[in-house]
Amino acid sequence: MRHRIAVIGGGPAGLAFARVLHRHDCPVTVLERESGPDARPPGGTLDLHEGLGQLALDKAGVLAEFWALSRPEGQAMRILDTDGTVLRDWRPGPDDRANPEIDRGQLRDLLLGPVDVRWGEHVTKVVPGGRDGVRVHLADGREETFDLVVGADGARSRTRPALSAVTPHYTGVTAVETSLDDIDTRHPDLARLIGDGSVAVYGVNRALVAQRGSGGHVKVYAQFRAPLDRHTKRDTADAGAVRSRLLALFDGWAAPLLDLLRHGTEFVHRPLYALPVAHTWAHVPGVTLLGDAAHLMPPLGAGANLALLEGAELAESLAAGTGDPDDTVRVFEERMWTRAARWASFTTAGLERLVSPDPAAALALFDRVQPPG
């Protein structure tokens, strides 16, 4: 295979795609808007599932390195009620490797490896149908042409409009993210509360989730139902003001739970958006989508796993093919849509139960619902 291939986006989907192509000695151009791999904090931690994210890393040839970095103990999950009573306390067995955790930054570095990324390349538009191929427009006025453009450019994809007029909609839930560093030394009581993995608390139309990463770093997510303009447009630079609003929103919850917000350092508002559950498009030769660009869904552990596997699967199929790569892309899209629709349905229903008027619905979800395959 020697076609001109570009992937837009250096996240999990784009890097998995590029890494698998590199493994098969297939050239690919990676265009990433960020100025470099450390341009901004890489985020929290991910659990990579057997048959999804782990399978993708196996295809990329980095599964052994993943196991050296991952935290199987991070699968531990504790659920509390708002007065701090422990309702569920699940801990993985010594050989449980179903969904081990890894920091997003570690995963990024693992996939980057030998992949050559063109940093600081801001794609503004993708135009298929040209006589010479698909044209990629860049913010500085340049244009480049490729035989295949893979949009792995996330929720605000600049590639998606070439295939679909659909845009993500607000789910009705906003998350405010904050962080605690060196928690075992600075806040040992909170470290014990969180344990080795995550702790989640569900109230009426709101939830509080704390997730341990490596090096004593913890991400805390305050989630609540609110109109889109109620909190999301407020300036988060004044951490004290944001903290006060959150403490008022979660007033009446147990003091140790509120300490997760009191000791948070910086705050980021993240309104949760999603694409329609069964988002598809009429196939367009030379362009396709992966990950959030294709099927943005509520953040319940599926998105990154699907993105990784899609990137790896498409790259593997293209590397193995000897015919028209467009036929390969058609087959891939059908498979991706079917699998993504199952997970989008699951995560959409999950968000409705986890942040709902009935906190018991969240507990029931953990007790009864099994994720799709």
Regions found by a protein language model. Give the residues of each.
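Short helix-loop capping/hinge motifs at secondary-structure junctions, enriched
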Residues: A64, D182-I194, P256
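Conserved mid-domain beta->alpha element of the FAD-binding
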Residues: A6-P27, L31-E34, V150-G151, V176, ...
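Conserved protein kinase catalytic core
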Residues: D38-A39, T159-R160, M297-P298
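C-terminal domain-closing interface element
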Residues: G350-G373
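FAD/FMN-dependent oxidoreductases across multiple families
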Residues: D196, G203-R206, R212-V218, F224-L300
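Short beta-strand micro-motifs enriched in acidic
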Residues: P128-R131, Q211-G215
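Accessory recognition modules or surfaces
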Residues: M1-A6, P12-A13, R33, D38-E50
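Conserved N-terminal helical subregion
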Residues: M1-I5, V20-H22, D47-I183, D229-T232, ...
